[in-house]
Amino acid sequence: LNMLRDSFGRTFPYIRLSITDVCNFKCGYCLPNGYMPNKSDNRKFLHLDEIKRLAKGLSELGVCKIRLTGGEPTVRKDFFEIVKVLKNESGIKKVVITTNGYHLDQKANKIVESGLDGINISIDSLNREIFKSITSHDRLEEILNGIIKLQKLNFNNIKINAVLLKGINSSENDFKD
């Protein structure tokens, strides 16, 4: 089997694939001013057929898991179509995402139906005010409700990511609930 290897001989059974750099949050540690499109920049994001072709090639090189990232991957209008193509037409065995959880409560059913294998949600504080100050969005309750909804739908491969920011959310109390 021809495997994807680096110069040290390490194989890559798993890759992160950024499908957009657009994000709807304005986290100070990432995009403090939010996503600022440059009108003179005519770049385009990978199209669905390009993602499919790339994933097929990666699968043939031994990659069995793809993590979709961004920006915020769910802002793509074809996000769920991308997941379905990766799951059903590429040879990739596991598809997971890293998301900020925006509208997670509204997307929970589609997440389960899409066949997604796992979700990592960035929640930098369980304190509503601190969360809002970091992300510029008052969406913590919506995100937590989305997690509960996913669990009720028996979707249990849910992980939480947090960026610790000294003096902002570095207290253990920011993560108790």
Pin down the residues of each PLM region.
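Conserved G/P- and acidic residue-centered "switch" motifs that form tight phosphate/ATP-binding loops
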Residues: 72
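Radical SAM enzyme core and accessory elements
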Residues: 1-5
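Canonical Radical SAM [4Fe-4S] cluster-binding loop centered on the CxxxCxxC motif
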Residues: 7-49, 61
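Radical SAM/AdoMet-radical enzyme domain recognition
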Residues: 48-67, 75-176
